């Protein structure tokens, strides 16, 4: 992230059974010491029949616009879990104004030769004229996080023939992912889609 972006931290784990639901989340910022403490709560519903299975959860916590520097990330009440977040100096005075695709799903797949590729799924918004399509996908892999920017363009005429609003497109990776990685996809309206994948 740059110092004119809305930064985000992602909390993930597993509930012991399906009786739990994600509750509220938030953060506390100690700017003087460059420390961000995040937290997320869980709601337990014991008055119903719950499947006795591990239930994964993922909670994105928006931190707002942070000043340049490297922050220590802590999790409230879990002192042994820490991470770092580097906020770079912005290269332009305004935030990125790309028109991102409304991605609703992302996955990493392997072909028969073991080569990895990224698949993005979603539905384009309707327009009064022409159509929207993904023009390019930029990816930055750093510290087990693959930041994905699916940039759309507005087209018309022949480019919109046989147009489908739903998309399921695959893109090659410049380098393979290993172990557990977070897919952080920038999407339309300033939001993000996040998913953890485990690759052996």
Task: Please provide the spans of the model-predicted regions.
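Exposed, flexible binding/inhibitory loops of compact, secreted disulfide-stabilized domains
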Residues: 1-200
């Amino acid at each position: 992230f740059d110092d004119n972006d809305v930064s985000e931290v992602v909390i993930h784990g597993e509930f012991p059974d399906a009786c739990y639901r994600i509750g509220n989340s938030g953060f506390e910022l100690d700017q003087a010491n460059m420390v961000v403490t995040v937290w997320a709560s869980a709601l337990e519903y014991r008055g119903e029949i719950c499947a006795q299975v591990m239930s994964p959860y993922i909670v994105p916590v928006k931190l707002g616009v942070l000043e340049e520097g490297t922050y220590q990330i802590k999790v409230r009440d879990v002192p042994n879990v820490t991470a770092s977040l580097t906020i770079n100096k912005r290269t332009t005075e305004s935030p990125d104004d790309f028109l991102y695709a409304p991605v609703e799903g992302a996955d990493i797949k392997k072909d028969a030769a073991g080569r990895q590729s990224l698949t993005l799924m979603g539905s384009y918004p309707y327009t009064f004229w022409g159509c929207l399509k993904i023009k390019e996908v930029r990816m930055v892999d750093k510290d087990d996080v693959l930041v994905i920017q699916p940039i759309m363009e507005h087209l018309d005429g022949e480019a919109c023939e046989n147009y489908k609003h739903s998309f399921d497109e695959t893109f090659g990776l410049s380098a393979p992912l290993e172990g557990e990685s977070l897919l952080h996809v920038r999407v339309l309206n300033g939001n993000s889609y996040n998913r953890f994948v485990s690759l052996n």
